[in-house]
Amino acid sequence: MAASGKLSTCRLPPLPTIREIIKLLRLQAAKQLSQNFLLDLRLTDKIVRKAGNLTNAYVYEVGPGPGGITRSILNADVAELLVVEKDTRFIPGLQMLSDAAPGKLRIVHGDVLTFKVEKAFSESLKRPWEDDPPNVHIIGNLPFSVSTPLIIKWLENISCRDGPFVYGRTQMTLTFQKEVAERLAANTGSKQRSRLSVMAQYLCNVRHIFTIPGQAFVPKPEVDVGVVHFTPLIQPKIEQPFKLVEKVVQNVFQFRRKYCHRGLRMLFPEAQRLESTGRLLELADIDPTLRPRQLSISHFKSLCDVYRKMCDEDPQLFAYNFREELKRRKSKNEEKEEDDAENYRL
C-alpha cells in the first residue's frame, strides 16, 4: 500500500496558471475525446500525494492535457516525468513546463493505448516481482472514453508481467467516472459489484481513495470523478491465463440480474450446455442460485480452475463463442426461409 507522501519543497518557477495557459493557447476540451480539465492545483496536489512518496521517482503520466497534474508531479521532486499526449494542441503548454524544469520532463506525442512504456525507463529500475514496488509510478486523469479499455489492457499486462510492469509491481493512481471507480473497488455482494471488480481485484489491491466533484473540472462533466489506487499483488488470487479468467467473468456478469448458472451456460455449446454447466458448478462447489454479485474471488477461482481442466480435456472449448453459434443459427434460418420462399414461387 502506498504511503501518503508529502509534496517536496522543490517548486517550479513562477508560471502562468493552467487557466491562463488554456486562454493563451485557445484550448478547448474536445468532447469526442472525453476531455475534462482539472484546474485546481489543490486537487492535483492531492492526487499526487495519494500516489505515495515520489521523491526521485520515475513517473509515467497519461493524458496530461494542459498540465495540471503534471505541475504537481514536478513539484514532488521526481527524478523524471514522462508524459504521453495524443492531442497536439497541448504540446506547447507542456513544453513550457519542460523549459521550467530542465531535464525533468520528457514529452511524447502518442497514444497511451499503443505506447511502449516498457522501453521508456532504464533497465536498472527493474525489481523482482516479489520485492517492494519499483520506484516507477503511473498517474493520470484519464479521458472517460479510454479509461476502461486502458485499465483492462494494464490488468492483462500485470497478469503477464509485461508493459509497464516489466519494472515490477508498478503502482497506478488514476481517475475514472465515479461509477467506474466504485465498481473497481466494490466488495462481494454490493450493488456495484461487476466484471471490473473481479478483474481488478484478483490481480491488485484496489482502493477508491477519494472523489472529486464534477464541478471541479472544465468543462463540468455530468458525473463526479473517483481517484483509484492500484498495487499489483505478488500472487494473483486466480492463477489462470488472463483471457480465460476474463471469459468466465464476462459470461457470468452478462446476466447480472439472473442466477450465476445462466451466464455460465454460455461457456458451452448448446448440445452439451446443461450437462457441462452442471458439471462445472458441481466440481467448483458453487451454488447455482447465487447472483453474479454474490460470487467472491474464491468462487471465481474455483470456476476458472475447473473450466481450465474442461478446456484441457476439450481443446476446442476455449475458442467457443456462443454469439458466433447464434449468428450461424440465424444465418441458417435465413437461408431456409429464402429456400422456402423460392420453392413457394416455383
Swiss-Prot record:
Q: Does the keyword GTP-binding apply?
A: no
| Catalyzed reactions per annotation | adenosine(N)/adenosine(N+1) in rRNA + 4 S-adenosyl-L-methionine = N(6)-dimethyladenosine(N)/N(6)-dimethyladenosine(N+1) in rRNA + 4 S-adenosyl-L-homocysteine + 4 H(+)
Show the transit peptide stretch.
1-27
The induction comment states: By the nuclear respiratory factors NRF1 and NRF2/GABPB2 and PGC-1 coactivators.
- InterPro entries referenced in this protein's UniProt entry, alphabetically: KsgA/Erm (IPR001737), rRNA_Ade_diMease-like_C (IPR023165), rRNA_Ade_Mease_Trfase_CS (IPR020596), rRNA_Ade_methylase_Trfase_N (IPR020598), rRNA_adenine_dimethylase (IPR011530), SAM-dependent_MTases_sf (IPR029063)
Q: What Pfam family does this protein match (any one)?
A: RrnaAD
Q: Which residues form the signal peptide?
A: none
Q: Show the GO cellular component annotation of the record.
A: mitochondrial matrix; mitochondrial nucleoid; mitochondrion
GO BP annotations of the record are: rRNA methylation; rRNA modification; transcription initiation at mitochondrial promoter
Q: In UniProt terms, what is the effect of altering N141A? A: Does not affect SAM-binding, DNA-binding nor transcription activator function
Q: Which domain of life is it from?
A: Eukaryota
The reported effect of K220A is:
Abolishes methyltransferase activity. Does not affect SAM-binding, DNA-binding nor transcription activator function
Tell me the compartments it is located in.
Mitochondrion
Q: Which GO terms describe its molecular function?
A: DNA binding; mitochondrial transcription factor activity; RNA binding; rRNA (adenine-N6,N6-)-dimethyltransferase activity; S-adenosyl-L-methionine binding
What's the EC number here? 2.1.1.-
Under HAMAP family, the record lists:
16SrRNA_methyltr_A
Subunit and partners: Interacts with mitochondrial RNA polymerase POLRMT. Interacts with TFAM. Bound to the maturing mtSSU until the late stages of assembly.
Would you identify the family this protein belongs to, as annotated? Answer: Belongs to the class I-like SAM-binding methyltransferase superfamily. rRNA adenine N(6)-methyltransferase family. KsgA subfamily.
Miscellaneous comment text of the record? It has been proposed that variations in TFB1M may influence the clinical expression of aminoglycoside-induced deafness caused by the A1555G mutation in the mitochondrial 12S rRNA. However, this was later questioned as patients with the A1555G mutation had similar 12S rRNA methylation levels to controls.
Question: What is this protein identified as?
Answer: Dimethyladenosine transferase 1, mitochondrial
